[in-house]
From Swiss-Prot:
The Asp-Asp-Xaa-Xaa-Asp/Glu (DDXXD/E) motif is important for the catalytic activity, presumably through binding to Mg(2+). The lineage of its organism: Eukaryota, Fungi, Dikarya, Basidiomycota, Agaricomycotina. Mg(2+) 1 binds at residues 87, 91. It is an enzyme of class 4 (lyase). PANTHER family: BETA-PINACENE SYNTHASE-RELATED (PTHR35201:SF4), TERPENE SYNTHASE (PTHR35201). The keyword Nucleotide-binding does not apply. The keyword Lyase applies. Signal peptide: none annotated. A motif (DDXXD motif) lies at residues 87-91. It comes from Coprinopsis cinerea (strain Okayama-7 / 130 / ATCC MYA-4618 / FGSC 9003) (Inky cap fungus). This is Linoleate 10R-lipoxygenase COP4.
Length: 345
């Protein structure tokens, strides 16, 4: 892996994305209610940071679930806030403790009567009650399975961090698909649309091509956008930028360029597979609606990444215009956490 430069140019992912962005009309009302719900538990030690990240995540929901009705959108906001609780609890835990936290989350998600008396179990039960009211049985089962895969992979990420180990690319892709929570968020699409797909639909080659392309596009875009924030915190091991630099002996700029080419291929695969599904009679129309809805995630995530200050802080408009990222030293990021700005910390 070559020495890291102090700046790099992001790939222009908007230029390869023909999908149209939109926002949810229920955003302000539902986001405020969801935020009040999670804050009523008083579990965040840094309220300013919690408020910003929650608001930022709810803004993301507005883009990626633009088509959701009020109740469904509110439930989606609740879920991203629940994930924030899980992350907040497990962020500084070792692998063993992170697995224990994950088990609480999964057990409460699978069983409405399971209770260890923890706040996490109570919050999870309250989300689950809203979710299962409208979700189909197959969707509920898959969602619980994905919750378990997510927490297992988050714990594995913690173990890799303890060992200062960076995975090879193929192993990393498999891990990143799960610990990013993108698949969990995609599972909410069935709930929103009021559909309950058979497991066989996910095994269809054309459906799977679109599904995994949409997942990888979001994961890889997030990694290149978040790299500066993560390197300033000293947490770069769970990022495809680092994986590419190490495995392929690339510079930071070369890794960014590589990601741009891969994202272009992922977008092309998604669009081609979606077009084939539209012309096919092999799968139910609900499967096509599901794949089309994933497009909101692909474009909405791009728009949100520069609309919010999550990754680039107060420089987000400049970075959007120039694509140039100046790497921040850790002291600068720490100072921004203590300032009055809305920079992510």
């Amino acid at each position: 892996m070559r020495p890291t430069a102090r700046q790099f140019t992001l790939p222009d992912l908007f230029s390869i994305c023909p999908l149209q962005d939109a926002t949810n009309p229920w955003y302000k009302q539902a986001a405020a209610e969801s935020r009040a719900w999670i804050n009523s538990y008083n579990i965040f030690t840094d309220r300013k940071r919690a408020f910003f990240i929650q608001g930022s995540n709810e803004l993301l929901c507005s883009h990626v679930y633009a088509y959701a009705g009020y109740e469904q959108f509110r439930t989606c906001c609740d879920f991203v806030n629940l994930l924030f609780v899980v992350d907040e609890i497990s962020d500084d835990q070792n692998g063993q403790d992170a697995r224990a936290t994950g088990r609480i989350f999964v057990n409460a998600m699978r069983d409405a009567h399971w209770d260890d008396g923890s706040i996490l179990a109570k919050i999870t039960h309250e989300f689950r009650e809203r979710f299962v009211r409208l979700a189909g049985p197959k969707t509920v089962r898959r969602f619980a399975d994905l919750c378990e895969s997510y927490t297992d992979c988050v714990a594995r990420e913690a173990e890799l961090r303890e060992r200062n180990q960076v995975l090879g690319l193929n192993d990393f892709i498999a891990l990143r698909r799960q610990n990013s929570a993108v698949l969990l968020c995609y599972s909410l699409v069935e709930y929103i649309l009021g559909i309950d797909l058979d497991d066989e639909v996910y095994e269809d080659p054309t459906f799977a091509k679109a599904y995994w392309a949409a997942c990888d596009f979001v994961c890889w875009a997030n990694d290149v956008y978040s790299y500066d924030m993560e390197q300033a915190k000293g947490h770069t091991g769970n990022n495809v930028v680092t994986v590419l630099m190490k495995e392929k002996d690339l510079s930071l700029q070369e890794a960014s360029d590589y990601i741009g080419r891969e994202c272009e291929k992922q977008m092309r695969d998604y669009l081609e597979a979606k077009s084939q599904l539209l012309q096919s009679t092999d799968l139910p129309q609900e499967a096509v609606r599901y794949i089309e809805a994933l497009g909101y995630w692909m474009v909405g995530n791009l728009v949100w990444s520069f609309e919010s200050q999550r990754y680039f802080g107060a420089q987000h408009e400049r970075v959007k215009a120039t694509h140039v990222v100046h790497l921040r030293p850790s002291s600068v990021l720490e100072a921004s956490c203590d300032s009055d700005s809305d920079s992510d910390c």
